[in-house]
Amino acid sequence: MVEHYPFKLNSEFDPQGDQPQAIEKIVKGVKEGKRHQTLLGATGTGKTFTMSNVIKEVGKPTLIIAHNKTLAGQLYSEFKEFFPENRVEYFVSYYDYYQPEAYVPSTDTFIEKDASINDEIDQLRHSATSALFERDDVIIIASVSCIYGLGNPEEYKDLVVSVRVGMEMDRSELLRKLVDVQYSRNDIDFQRGTFRVRGDVVEIFPASREEMCIRVEFFGDEIDRIREVNYLTGEVIREREHFAIFPASHFVTREEKMKIAIERIEKELEERLKELKDENKLLEAQRLEQRTNYDLEMMREMGFCSGIENYSVHLTLRPLGSTPYTLLDYFGDDWLVMIDESHVTLPQIRGMFNGDRARKQVLVDHGFRLPSAMDNRPLKFEEFEQKTNQLVYVSATPGPYEIEHTDEMIEQIIRPTGLLDPKIDVRPTKNQIDDLLSEIQERIDRDERVLVTTLTKKMSEDLTTYMKEAGIKVNYLHSEIKTLERIEIIRDLRMGTYDVVVGINLLREGIDIPEVSLVVILDADKEGFLRSNRSLIQTIGRAARNEKGEVIMYADKITDSMQYALDETQRRRDIQTAHNEKYGITPKTINKKIHDVISATVDNDETNEKQQTELPKKMTKKERQKTIENIEKEMKKAAKDLDFEKATELRDMLFELKSEG
């Protein structure tokens, strides 16, 4: 039974600027049943806050799709702060590293699937799907992986093992049910997706939980007591009357269905082998027979096999070629989709199917997979459209799809801080580097930062070297730098370790920096992807978080894209200036906290340790408790990774925190 809870928005601010009218229009549109709406929100106008207010007013389960994991992570943190009492979940691909299986016919090379699964993200995925069956105040932040195949939601829901105090059930029946939903018994290494047995006590570690296990105590053939327990310390967290244990895998199938699925796979194998032999593809036939029979044997014995998702069409007993189940099917009938940065995310959703199909076709043709493996795939764009109900697109520069499907753009141009879109100055390319250096020096003297965008890697490198020789603290952002390193460089720019960052594509995640007062666009008149009207507006927006924000474009002619960007920016400035004059608002630079890099990258440098040991003196009781929990988590992880020195340091830190409490 899905429980009802209202969305409770936690914020010290009320909607300001353009936010109230944008919220009102979107909410009205959703309530009137509008299918497509677009929020055209300029950079820095508080689009996330607007989205949060819409969710609160509409009160529907919501899926928010971002175009990469990092952006999804940022949104997840923000929405968790806005909705601490509701279920905010995170659903992205659980692979830290993923090499899909592939075959290169020209060199006769088969590349086996190789992947490293992030256990924490897997737990968050299970938490997301189980939340949708437990309550209706759910917000799931997802990457495009939400359109990839997942198990049948009905099967997932029906196979839930429900335990209740006073229920008649003997211990062995519970153990059997747990094995059916792919939990395994492990009395020694107790981890997610396992259970352990001690006399009349069964402890289960749900796949959707991080540190909490369920202790079920029996008295004869009756459940006597259910408790939530910390799996490591054994400390009882609370008593429970009832608990629902969701399957340990999304690809879970009942025994009788598994038998039918195996029969279907055998039948398909027989037909496919005949086809291959008729075409005289004997090597391919032998390869397919050997691989498929091995998988079938594993399914009979264990209930699953490696790469079981390739048989998903049979396991869910769907007709060949039918639409796969995805996260979208786990939502009920009445729900909302918000697509963040829709001008990037929608083309990504559109392109997923074709890329996946091309690779799988080669595997099928050469006998590595049955043709039905093609049905383990992401959704086609038309299927995505059919499965979604109401959509809100969010972007500073909506793409053609959003423009075509929305009758009215809901504009959010006025910033709560009164900040204007930056002034734009177009200058000739003659002596541009000397001119640029003098502009940078002016900003350094005012303790402000600069972003410079170039067109080629070589130019970025040469410019960076030249600036370093001129004594400027500069770093260079390029595509080979890992996501977390990018975030670190941005953080260092904000903190003043660097004054300038040079890069080709500065539109990627995490580049909203209030300290930046100047954005420089070199070769602005070279038409192309990086100098299209959409890219130019996005790049200009990077200077819109500082009251002294300016943009300099170096160009010898004004292209159509430049003209569009100049006109659109001026249009927005006029609206913003009129609003400020009407209400007597003075623009002021955003004051944004400098967050540490995502916790997955714990720094070990002295400053970090010093900072952490100083924390207790200036923390509230709630913050202290949260810090204790985080350090405990890191300590256990360090011990598990055999990094005992780090675990000892963290333990000492814990003692200090607890003694201060």
From Swiss-Prot:
Single GO molecular function: excinuclease ABC activity
Biased composition (Basic and acidic residues): 607-617
Residue ranges of the motif Beta-hairpin: 94-117
Domain Helicase C-terminal: 432-598
Keywords linked to the UniProt accession: ATP-binding, Cytoplasm, DNA damage, DNA excision, DNA repair, Excision nuclease, Nucleotide-binding, SOS response
Domain Helicase ATP-binding intervals: 28-414
Annotated ranges, domain UVR: 625-660
Location, primary (coarse class): cytoplasm
Location relative to the cell: Cytoplasm
PANTHER family on file: UVRABC SYSTEM PROTEIN B
Function: The UvrABC repair system catalyzes the recognition and processing of DNA lesions. A damage recognition complex composed of 2 UvrA and 2 UvrB subunits scans DNA for abnormalities. Upon binding of the UvrA(2)B(2) complex to a putative damaged site, the DNA wraps around one UvrB monomer. DNA wrap is dependent on ATP binding by UvrB and probably causes local melting of the DNA helix, facilitating insertion of UvrB beta-hairpin between the DNA strands. Then UvrB probes one DNA strand for the presence of a lesion.
Record-given protein name: UvrABC system protein B
